[in-house]
Amino acid sequence: EAGDDKAILLMMKWGYEGSKAFIGGNPVKKIINSSREIIEILSVDLKACNNYKSGKESLEKINCPTLCIFGDLDKMVPLKVGNKMSELIKNSETKVITDCGHMIIFEKAFEMRKIVKEFILKLKK
């Protein structure tokens, strides 16, 4: 649709806000070759997100230990929104990764892995 290319490029820029040229100091060197590779998938995803209306109710139903990890530079799920989300989840823990956008697993893979490992080990105690 009109403006899709620009929207995708902005999402890619915002998603990887904490990294330079989509490189996060981890094994993943290049994530995407062109906006055309994802335009159809992204369109479907955005429509699904836009049509989803029961997020709050769904979050309130979660009762198992939950780890919420956010990037402090994320523009797609700003920290303020992420914190509101995690507050709705009973028994949740929130971690924030600095200098990181929306694509945490690619931008800060090692830091994220460490946080997840610590969370899992704590659950085993």
Q: Where do the model's predicted regions map?
A:
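Structural signature of beta-strand start/N-cap positions in the alpha/beta core
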Residues: 58, 65-67, 90-93
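Conserved catalytic core of Hanks-type protein kinase domains
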Residues: 61, 88, 106
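A short, basic/aromatic alpha-helical/loop segment that forms part
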Residues: 52-53, 75-76, 103-107
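Catalytic active-site module of serine/aspartate enzymes centered on a nucleophile-bearing elbow/loop
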Residues: 92-125
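Conserved alpha/beta-hydrolase catalytic His-Asp/Glu region
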Residues: 2-61
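Generic recognition of short, well-ordered alpha-helical segments
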Residues: 57, 80-84, 107-110
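Short beta-strand/loop motif that positions the catalytic acidic residue
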Residues: 62, 68-70, 74
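Short alpha-helix in the alpha/beta-hydrolase fold that links the catalytic acid
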Residues: 64, 78-87
